[in-house]
Regions:
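Conserved "HGTGT" condensation-loop signature of ketosynthase/thiolase-family condensing enzymes
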Residues: 1-108, 112-154, 174-177
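Active-site histidine-anchored catalytic micro-motif
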Residues: 168
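Short conserved active-site loop signatures built around small residues
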Residues: 165
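Short, high-confidence coil segments that cap the C-terminus of an alpha-helix
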Residues: 180-182
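Short loop-beta-helix segment that forms the pyridoxal 5′-phosphate
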Residues: 154-160
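Internal active-site segments that recognize and position negatively charged phosphoryl groups
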Residues: 171
Length: 182
């Protein structure tokens, strides 16, 4: 069996949008929870959340392409780009058919679901983006990552509620350990 190691990491979190910032925030005991800023919470009992702050997708994806994607894809692309860079993966350094994406998500694109349902209700079905359905399905993120990096191996998205991250890591480890992927 193959030995499995993590060679690159990326992070987009409420306490840092890259691994060094995230790690320093963890060491400093920084809390990522704060008042909800994305919508009016006056009618809700819950007023706090752990929102990602100061994230700029334009560092990773061009404007028009970014507009077609859900925020979940934005965050995943940023974290994956950081991990790919840290691992030193460049075209020609890996076999694309033995390199894949197993992306874990507990739920699909909520932001695009919210905005497109709002359009449907207020402006009618003709105003709903043709990208709405693909972008709200969780496995679209794995597809974006595979296309972006040229990975043509396994590509899927386990969805197993709160265990999803560990599920995806375990699946990736097994794919490498048993020789299906590099």
């Amino acid at each position: 069996m193959e030995r499995v190691v993590i060679t690159g990491m990326g992070a987009v979190t409420p306490i840092g949008n890259d691994v060094p910032t995230f790690w320093q925030s963890l060491k400093d005991g920084k809390c990522g929870i704060g008042p909800i800023t994305r919508f009016d919470v006056s009618d809700y009992k819950v007023k706090l959340a752990a929102e990602v702050k100061d994230f700029d997708i334009s560092q990773y994806v061009e404007g028009r392409e970014a507009k077609r994607m859900d925020k979940s894809s934005h965050f995943a692309i940023a974290a994956a780009q950081q991990a790919v860079d840290q691992a030193g993966l460049t075209p020609g350094t890996f076999n694309p058919y033995r390199t894949g994406v197993i992306y874990g998500s507990g739920i699909g694109g909520l932001y695009i679901t919210e905005t497109e349902v709002e359009k449907l209700i207020n402006k009618g079905p003709g105003r709903v983006s043709p990208f709405a359905i693909p972008e709200l399905i969780p496995n679209i993120v794995a597809a974006h990552l595979s296309m972006r990096f040229g990975f043509k191996g396994e590509n899927y998205c386990p969805v197993s509620a709160c265990a999803t991250a560990n599920h995806a890591i375990g699946e990736a480890m097994r794919a490498i350990r048993h020789g299906y992927q590099d």
